[in-house]
Design a protein with these regions (language model features):
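Flexible, acidic/histidine-containing loops and adjacent segments that form or flank the divalent-metal
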Residues: 67, 73-76, 87-117, 163-165, ...
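Active-site neighborhood of phospho(di)ester-bond hydrolases with catalytic His/Asp-centered motifs
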Residues: 9-11, 34-42, 62-64, 115-118, ...
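Acidic/histidine-rich helix-loop elements
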Residues: 9-15, 73-84, 149-160
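Active-site environment of divalent metal-dependent phosphoester hydrolases
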Residues: 16, 42-48, 68-71, 121-124, ...
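Conserved beta-strand hairpin/beta-sheet module of binuclear metal-dependent hydrolase folds
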Residues: 1-27, 31, 125-147
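Accessory terminal helices/loops
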Residues: 133-135, 145-227
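Active-site HxH/HxHxD metal-binding segment of metal-dependent hydrolases
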Residues: 15-16, 26-103, 131, 200, ...
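Core dinuclear metal-dependent hydrolase active-site scaffold
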Residues: 1, 100-137
Length: 227
C-alpha cells in the first residue's frame, strides 16, 4: 500500500480473482487504488487470476519477458520444467516488460525485481522496504525456487537451466532480507516461523537459498545415478 496507489504481487488461480478482489475491499482498499500487478512465477496457480484482477482494478500488469509470453499466450512456456503438468490460464495483455533486474516505483513504493529463473524460467523475486514509524524492515518475496518437474524431465539434460538455477540461489542468498516471504509459504517455512512469534530474521534469505541448493544438488545427484 503506497501514497499514490497500491501494488499486488500474484493473483492465484483463475477462480481466485474475485476472491482476492473481495478481500482487498474488505481491507478498506478500493480496487481502483490497485495500480500495478506483478508476479513471481508464471504458473496458473499464481498468475491465473491476474486477468480478472486487471479487469476489476484497471491496473497495469508488469512481467518478465518469458512470463509475459506465457501470460499473453495463456499457456506455460514449453521449456518450463513442469510444462506437461500445468494448466492453461486466462490470457492477459502485459503493459510493461521487466528486463533483467528492474525497479518498479509507485509514489513512495520502490520494489526491486530480481530475475530468479529455476522453478520457472521467467520467475522474479521482489525486494522492498516497509516502515512503521522509524522502524524499517527489508522484505523479500522470493520465488519458491524448488527443483520440481514433470515426469520425464531431467535437469541434467538442461545444463543451462541448472546454471541459471544456481545463479538464482546465489542471488537470493545474498539479498539483504529482514523478512522473507514466498509464493509457496511452506517453501520458506512460514508457518513454523509464525509459531515462533516473529518473521524477522536477517539470515532468512541465506538459509532459504542454502536449503534449496541442497535440494537441487540432491535432485541432480539422483539423476546422475539414473534414479
Amino acid at each position: 500500500i503506497g501514497s499514490t496507489g497500491d501494488v499486488l504481487i500474484d493473483g492465484g488461480p483463475a477462480d481466485a480473482g474475485d476472491i482476492i478482489a473481495a478481500n482487498i475491499t474488505q481491507l478498506g482498499v478500493a480496487l481502483s487504488d490497485v495500480k500495478i500487478l506483478l508476479h513471481t512465477h508464471e504458473h496458473h496457480d499464481h498468475v491465473g487470476g491476474l486477468a480478472r484482477l486487471k479487469q476489476l482494478t484497471g491496473a497495469r500488469l508488469f512481467a518478465s519477458p518469458l512470463a509475459a509470453q506465457a501470460l499473453e499466450r495463456g499457456t506455460p512456456n514449453p521449456d518450463d520444467p513442469q510444462y506437461a503438468d500445468h494448466h492453461p490460464l486466462p490470457a492477459v495483455r502485459v503493459d510493461r516488460i521487466l528486463e533483467g533486474n528492474s525497479t518498479v516505483t509507485l509514489g513512495n513504493l520502490t520494489l526491486k525485481a530480481y530475475a530468479t529463473p529455476g522453478h520457472t524460467l521467467g520467475a522474479l523475486t521482489w525486494q522492498w522496504q516497509s516502515c512503521e514509524g522509524d522502524d524499517c524492515k527489508t522484505i523479500v518475496y522470493a520465488d519458491s525456487l524448488t527443483p520440481v518437474s514433470s515426469d520425464g524431465y531431467k535437469f541434467t539434460d538442461h545444463r543451462d537451466v541448472v546454471a541459471a538455477f544456481n545463479n538464482s540461489l546465489v542471488r537470493v542468498g545474498s539479498l539483504q532480507c529482514d523478512i522473507l516471504l514466498s509464493p509457496h509459504p511452506s517453501a520458506s517455512g512460514l508457518r513454523d516461523r509464525l509459531l515462533k512469534g516473529s518473521l524477522v530474521d536477517p539470515t532468512a534469505c541465506f538459509t532459504f537459498a542454502n536449503g534449496l541448493k541442497q535440494q537441487l544438488d540432491a535432485r541432480l545427484k539422483k539423476e546422475d545415478n539414473g534414479e
